[in-house]
């Protein structure tokens, strides 16, 4: 509840609690944002528990950039430290809370932990442990003002990290998280690496495109995909450095990347972060049935768009209807045009 209320804060408005109340009984039906905050706390707990279960043989030590994912994560962590610190200093609690949720859930949990957990089984286990604990410890300290109880419980069960070492390398851990040293932006500034962030964002774009296509066409997670990526020379170089990360995450049978590669036949195209990702669907889906489905959706969208345009062409409607109603109709027409463009492009992919 505390975290949810913080995410609802703005600089110039009262907090509006998102509760849906039954008009007759006056009882709470649900609170979507509260449920989302609850899910986030559960995510923090489960991610922390997973990492702590994999700390056998761990000893505290300095974090070291060994992979592109490490460089990306440490850079994002440095920016998170700066963002949260400035949020506290400037009283922008809503932006801070939403920002830390996006960082820990979408970047730490969904990507860094997933990419790094394989290293916990190999020769680089100890350094992977140190890097993960460094990220977790810093994140827990950043989230402590927002949700003090769960973070205190997690931190109390964590091993010491590099943040607890004194100048001689001895462990000097605080008795409680609430009096532990705050992560200072100046100490993390050395990790900021824009090139590393760009490289990993490209990796995420390719993997996300493959996963979205797999989900959209209900393909088995075990089904290997043929993926082709077209981008500029610099981006291709960055992607090649992350090939060993992309291939298992996207579960590719083949991964072809280049500046002038051709779009494969019967493939779906996804454009993200300035790169074109083509996922071959031939042999994976019924192309004729999929094309028929898309054409049916196009017909429905065209019909609705024609209705919107007819209404907007009526001068009486535009003059007499509330401005908000007119704008809503215009927004829907614009949205339908975007939908039609996307659907038409998808049909072309199957041609």
Model-derived regions: residue spans:
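Feature 926 captures the class I aminoacyl-tRNA synthetase adenylation module centered on the KMSKS loop
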Residues: 19-351
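Alpha-helical recognition segments enriched in aromatics with Gly/Pro capping
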Residues: 1-25
